[in-house]
Protein backbone atom coordinates (compact mmCIF):
# COMPACT_ATOMS: atom_id res chain seq x y z
CA UNK A 1 0.00 0.00 0.00
CA UNK A 2 1.42 3.38 -0.90
CA UNK A 3 1.86 6.31 1.49
CA UNK A 4 -0.89 8.45 -0.01
CA UNK A 5 -3.42 5.65 0.35
CA UNK A 6 -2.27 5.10 3.95
CA UNK A 7 -2.75 8.79 4.76
CA UNK A 8 -6.19 8.80 3.14
CA UNK A 9 -7.19 5.66 5.06
CA UNK A 10 -5.96 7.19 8.32
CA UNK A 11 -8.05 10.31 7.68
CA UNK A 12 -11.14 8.19 7.06
CA UNK A 13 -10.55 6.14 10.21
CA UNK A 14 -10.13 9.36 12.20
CA UNK A 15 -13.42 10.69 10.87
CA UNK A 16 -11.86 13.50 8.85
CA UNK A 17 -14.45 14.12 6.18
CA UNK A 18 -14.11 17.86 5.67
CA UNK A 19 -11.79 18.97 2.86
CA UNK A 20 -10.50 21.71 5.17
CA UNK A 21 -9.16 19.10 7.60
CA UNK A 22 -7.59 16.87 4.95
CA UNK A 23 -3.86 16.76 4.23
CA UNK A 24 -4.78 17.89 0.68
CA UNK A 25 -5.78 21.29 2.13
CA UNK A 26 -2.10 22.19 2.51
CA UNK A 27 -1.99 22.45 -1.30
CA UNK A 28 -5.29 24.31 -1.75
CA UNK A 29 -3.61 27.28 -3.43
CA UNK A 30 -1.61 25.28 -5.97
CA UNK A 31 -3.09 23.46 -8.96
CA UNK A 32 0.14 21.68 -9.98
CA UNK A 33 0.88 18.00 -9.45
CA UNK A 34 4.12 16.06 -9.78
CA UNK A 35 4.05 13.01 -12.06
CA UNK A 36 6.98 10.65 -11.58
CA UNK A 37 8.18 7.26 -12.80
CA UNK A 38 6.88 7.95 -16.30
CA UNK A 39 7.72 5.62 -19.14
CA UNK A 40 10.23 7.68 -21.13
CA UNK A 41 8.37 7.03 -24.38
CA UNK A 42 5.29 8.96 -23.20
CA UNK A 43 4.71 12.42 -24.67
CA UNK A 44 2.98 15.53 -23.39
CA UNK A 45 -0.07 14.46 -25.39
CA UNK A 46 -0.16 11.07 -23.67
CA UNK A 47 0.02 12.75 -20.26
CA UNK A 48 -2.78 15.16 -21.15
CA UNK A 49 -4.95 12.29 -22.37
CA UNK A 50 -4.59 10.32 -19.13
CA UNK A 51 -4.86 13.22 -16.70
CA UNK A 52 -7.77 14.96 -18.43
CA UNK A 53 -9.97 12.24 -16.94
CA UNK A 54 -9.87 14.15 -13.64
CA UNK A 55 -10.11 17.74 -14.84
CA UNK A 56 -8.99 20.24 -17.45
CA UNK A 57 -5.19 20.43 -17.71
CA UNK A 58 -3.93 23.90 -18.57
CA UNK A 59 -0.18 23.28 -18.47
CA UNK A 60 2.13 20.28 -18.72
CA UNK A 61 5.90 20.36 -18.45
CA UNK A 62 7.57 17.08 -19.34
CA UNK A 63 11.16 17.30 -18.14
CA UNK A 64 13.55 16.63 -21.01
CA UNK A 65 17.31 16.35 -21.33
CA UNK A 66 18.63 19.68 -22.63
CA UNK A 67 21.00 18.01 -25.11
CA UNK A 68 19.01 15.05 -26.41
CA UNK A 69 15.43 16.20 -25.83
CA UNK A 70 14.61 12.80 -24.35
CA UNK A 71 12.16 12.53 -21.49
CA UNK A 72 13.66 12.34 -18.01
CA UNK A 73 10.66 10.36 -16.72
CA UNK A 74 8.84 13.05 -14.75
CA UNK A 75 6.50 15.96 -15.39
CA UNK A 76 4.46 18.69 -13.77
CA UNK A 77 0.84 19.24 -14.70
CA UNK A 78 -1.44 22.13 -13.78
CA UNK A 79 -5.21 21.82 -13.65
CA UNK A 80 -7.70 24.59 -14.31
CA UNK A 81 -9.44 23.73 -11.02
CA UNK A 82 -7.25 22.91 -8.02
CA UNK A 83 -9.78 20.30 -6.81
CA UNK A 84 -8.82 18.17 -9.81
CA UNK A 85 -5.38 17.71 -8.23
CA UNK A 86 -6.99 15.83 -5.34
CA UNK A 87 -8.78 13.47 -7.73
CA UNK A 88 -5.61 12.85 -9.75
CA UNK A 89 -3.43 12.27 -6.68
CA UNK A 90 -5.93 9.92 -5.06
CA UNK A 91 -6.82 7.97 -8.21
CA UNK A 92 -3.69 7.86 -10.36
CA UNK A 93 -0.92 7.41 -7.79
CA UNK A 94 0.30 3.85 -8.37
CA UNK A 95 -1.64 3.52 -11.64
CA UNK A 96 0.40 1.58 -14.22
CA UNK A 97 1.06 3.09 -17.62
CA UNK A 98 3.60 1.66 -20.02
CA UNK A 99 4.60 -0.98 -17.45
CA UNK A 100 5.45 1.58 -14.76
CA UNK A 101 3.55 2.56 -11.61
CA UNK A 102 3.08 6.33 -11.61
CA UNK A 103 4.09 8.42 -8.61
CA UNK A 104 1.62 11.29 -8.33
CA UNK A 105 1.66 13.93 -5.61
CA UNK A 106 0.84 17.55 -4.93
CA UNK A 107 3.70 19.96 -5.45
CA UNK A 108 4.56 23.60 -4.97
CA UNK A 109 5.96 23.80 -8.50
CA UNK A 110 6.64 27.24 -9.92
CA UNK A 111 7.63 27.52 -13.59
CA UNK A 112 11.18 28.76 -14.17
CA UNK A 113 11.66 31.99 -16.05
CA UNK A 114 14.05 30.17 -18.39
CA UNK A 115 11.09 28.16 -19.67
CA UNK A 116 9.38 31.28 -21.03
CA UNK A 117 10.61 30.63 -24.59
CA UNK A 118 9.43 27.02 -24.29
CA UNK A 119 5.96 28.16 -23.15
CA UNK A 120 5.73 30.68 -25.96
CA UNK A 121 6.74 28.08 -28.57
CA UNK A 122 4.25 25.53 -27.24
CA UNK A 123 1.46 28.12 -27.09
CA UNK A 124 2.25 29.23 -30.64
CA UNK A 125 2.11 25.64 -31.87
CA UNK A 126 -1.13 24.94 -30.02
CA UNK A 127 -2.65 28.13 -31.43
CA UNK A 128 -1.63 27.03 -34.95
CA UNK A 129 -3.14 23.59 -34.33
CA UNK A 130 -6.39 25.14 -33.11
CA UNK A 131 -6.54 27.46 -36.10
CA UNK A 132 -5.72 24.55 -38.43
CA UNK A 133 -8.37 22.39 -36.80
CA UNK A 134 -10.98 25.16 -37.01
CA UNK A 135 -10.11 25.80 -40.66
CA UNK A 136 -10.27 22.07 -41.41
CA UNK A 137 -13.70 21.83 -39.78
CA UNK A 138 -14.93 24.83 -41.79
CA UNK A 139 -13.63 23.27 -45.01
CA UNK A 140 -15.35 19.98 -44.22
CA UNK A 141 -18.64 21.76 -43.48
CA UNK A 142 -18.33 23.88 -46.63
CA UNK A 143 -17.66 20.79 -48.72
CA UNK A 144 -20.75 19.06 -47.27
CA UNK A 145 -22.88 22.08 -48.23
CA UNK A 146 -21.76 21.96 -51.87
CA UNK A 147 -23.90 20.04 -54.37
CA UNK A 148 -22.30 16.89 -55.80
From Swiss-Prot:
Protein's UniProt keywords contain Ribonucleoprotein: no
Organism from which the protein derives: Saccharomyces cerevisiae (strain ATCC 204508 / S288c)
One GO molecular-function entry: RNA binding
GO cellular component: cytoplasm; nucleus; precatalytic spliceosome; Prp19 complex; RES complex; spliceosomal complex; U2 snRNP
Note: Present with 922 molecules/cell in log phase SD medium.
Quaternary structure, from the entry: Component of the 45S U1.U2.U4/U6.U5 penta-snRNP particle, a subcomplex of the spliceosome. Belongs to the CWC complex (or CEF1-associated complex), a spliceosome sub-complex reminiscent of a late-stage spliceosome composed of the U2, U5 and U6 snRNAs and at least BUD13, BUD31, BRR2, CDC40, CEF1, CLF1, CUS1, CWC2, CWC15, CWC21, CWC22, CWC23, CWC24, CWC25, CWC27, ECM2, HSH155, IST3, ISY1, LEA1, MSL1, NTC20, PRP8, PRP9, PRP11, PRP19, PRP21, PRP22, PRP45, PRP46, SLU7, SMB1, SMD1, SMD2, SMD3, SMX2, SMX3, SNT309, SNU114, SPP2, SYF1, SYF2, RSE1 and YJU2.
RRM domain mapped to chain residues: 31-109
Keywords of the record: Cytoplasm, mRNA processing, mRNA splicing, Nucleus, RNA-binding, Spliceosome
Protein name from the UniProt record: U2 snRNP component IST3
Function recorded in the entry: Required for pre-mRNA splicing and spliceosome assembly. As part of the pre-mRNA retention and splicing (RES) complex, required for nuclear pre-mRNA retention and efficient splicing. Required for MER1-activated splicing.
Effect of gene knockout: Cells have a slow growth phenotype that is exacerbated at 37 degrees Celsius. Deletion mutants have a significant pre-mRNA leakage at 25 degrees Celsius.
Similarity comment text for this entry: Belongs to the IST3 family.
GO biological process: generation of catalytic spliceosome for first transesterification step; maintenance of RNA location; mRNA export from nucleus; mRNA splicing, via spliceosome; spliceosomal complex assembly; U2-type prespliceosome assembly
Amino acid sequence: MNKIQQINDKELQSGILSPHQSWHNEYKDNAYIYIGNLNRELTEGDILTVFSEYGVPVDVILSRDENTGESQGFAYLKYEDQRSTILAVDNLNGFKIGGRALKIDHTFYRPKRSLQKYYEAVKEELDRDIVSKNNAEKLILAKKDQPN
